[in-house]
């Protein structure tokens, strides 16, 4: 059991898994250090140095936060992501789900496969390379690949053309200045749903993700 303010460190070539009371799991790379605090908003992981991968459990009304000490805060309610903190700043990478990253008063939403840094001097690298040290790297890489393929396929779904005329226009009140006609999205939604269900049935990583989403 961890007491408030207890610091957890890993030595050179060491590795550790820490399970929180809410079910979240923190995987630590060697030469990493963090401590925990908790308040009415949720639990905060204060990452002093090193790299971690967090499998955040569903948080309900609270959130799980990561404070990197350089003015950057990451907020999640249930997702898988990594944070790498060093002297130049931090790099946040999302494996699954989405995180809200607040740095210097500016908030950004990151989703699976995306990455952000707190300084322009920090190089961006592929997410799969960022978490290659993890004991679960192969599974994470499979998840990233599955979502990347799914997003590409969904991006190819034909979008309806712009509607610039409609029989309803004649029914508009006299004097109407602006009329906006939305395209019919039914076929697009149906096709996207079909593709998602098909890929979920075919891919174990997507099935695992879908099962977690459905249970939440």
Which residue ranges define each predicted feature?
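Structural boundary/hinge residues at secondary-structure and domain interfaces
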Residues: 138-216
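Flexible, surface-exposed loop/linker segments and immediately adjacent secondary-structure boundaries
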Residues: 1-137
């Amino acid at each position: 059991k961890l007491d408030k303010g207890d610091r957890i460190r890993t030595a050179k070539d060491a590795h550790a898994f820490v399970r929180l009371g809410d079910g979240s799991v923190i995987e630590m790379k060697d030469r990493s250090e963090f401590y925990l605090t908790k308040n009415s908003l949720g639990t905060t992981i204060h990452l002093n140095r090193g790299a971690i991968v967090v499998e955040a459990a569903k948080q309900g009304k609270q959130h799980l936060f990561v404070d990197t000490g350089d003015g950057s805060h990451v907020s999640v309610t249930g997702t898988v992501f990594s944070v790498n903190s060093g002297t130049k700043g931090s790099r946040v990478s999302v494996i699954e789900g989405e995180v809200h990253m607040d740095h210097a008063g500016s908030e950004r939403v990151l989703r699976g496969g995306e990455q952000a840094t707190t300084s322009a001097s920090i190089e961006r690298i592929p997410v799969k390379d960022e978490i290659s040290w993890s004991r679960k790297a192969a599974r994470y890489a499979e998840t990233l690949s599955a979502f990347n393929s799914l997003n590409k396929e969904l991006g190819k779904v034909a979008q309806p053309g712009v509607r610039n005329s409609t029989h309803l226009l004649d029914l508009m009140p006299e004097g109407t200045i602006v009329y906006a006609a939305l395209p019919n999205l039914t076929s697009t939604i149906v096709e996207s749903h079909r593709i998602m269900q098909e890929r979920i049935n075919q891919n174990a990583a997507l099935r695992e993700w879908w099962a977690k989403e459905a249970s939440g």
